[in-house]
């Protein structure tokens, strides 16, 4: 995630707060039901992590994030304030600005799942991947992302001539399908509502 703020007529301190929030509820169904159990949250000098477990299926996922912070395109290493709460973890980073100054935060996120790592290794794996993403850099990651999607479109695109609305609709659905599942792992499947819906708790079943 890359986020920039430019001061128009403000002089003072601007703070950006990259965090994880584990206190998320299901918006569409049973809004009082919590999705995650938080196993552990914390920060290192440069990373924050949130280790979670699903309430229904006992799957564990650890999210890790790190960041880079710029003022007028020059990286600044302002002393961050650590945020360490039971269900929220991250940093607050700030710098003094005057009109015309721009501050930019790039947030690098990695996710490690118990499908692919031993549970005791999830924090280390996610933190390591987040740091690797930061080292790779935003521009390279964006280019790799575009290339990966271009390969998907080259293989799956459907052209509908003379009907822009239908063309947009089919491409939107192809995008949602591949956001949900690409076929790489036979243990996974497509949830009933895809990636954009919360119905059925994400369960997959056959009718």
Predicted regions located by residue number:
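Aromatic-rich carbohydrate-recognition surfaces in CAZymes
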Residues: 201-207
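Acidic/polar, glycine-enriched structural segments that form the non-catalytic walls/loops
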Residues: 1-200
């Amino acid at each position: 995630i890359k986020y920039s703020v430019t001061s128009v007529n403000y002089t003072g301190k601007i703070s950006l707060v990259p965090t994880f929030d584990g206190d998320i509820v299901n918006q569409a169904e049973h809004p009082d039901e919590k999705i995650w159990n938080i196993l552990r949250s914390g920060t290192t000098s440069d990373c924050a992590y949130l280790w979670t477990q699903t309430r229904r299926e006992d799957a564990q996922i650890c999210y890790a994030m790190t960041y880079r912070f710029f003022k007028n395109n020059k990286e600044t290493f302002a002393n961050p304030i650590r945020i360490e709460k039971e269900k929220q973890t991250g940093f607050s980073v700030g710098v003094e600005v005057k009109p015309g100054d721009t501050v930019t935060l790039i947030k690098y996120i990695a996710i490690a799942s118990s499908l692919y790592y031993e549970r005791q290794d999830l924090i280390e794996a996610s933190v390591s991947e987040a740091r690797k993403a930061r080292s790779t850099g935003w521009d390279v990651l964006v280019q790799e992302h575009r290339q990966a999607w271009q390969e998907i479109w080259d293989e799956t695109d459907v052209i509908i001539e003379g009907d822009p609305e239908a063309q947009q609709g089919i491409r939107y659905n192809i995008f949602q399908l591949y956001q949900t599942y690409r076929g790489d792992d036979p243990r996974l499947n497509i949830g009933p509502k895809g990636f954009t819906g919360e119905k059925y708790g994400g369960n997959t079943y056959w009718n």
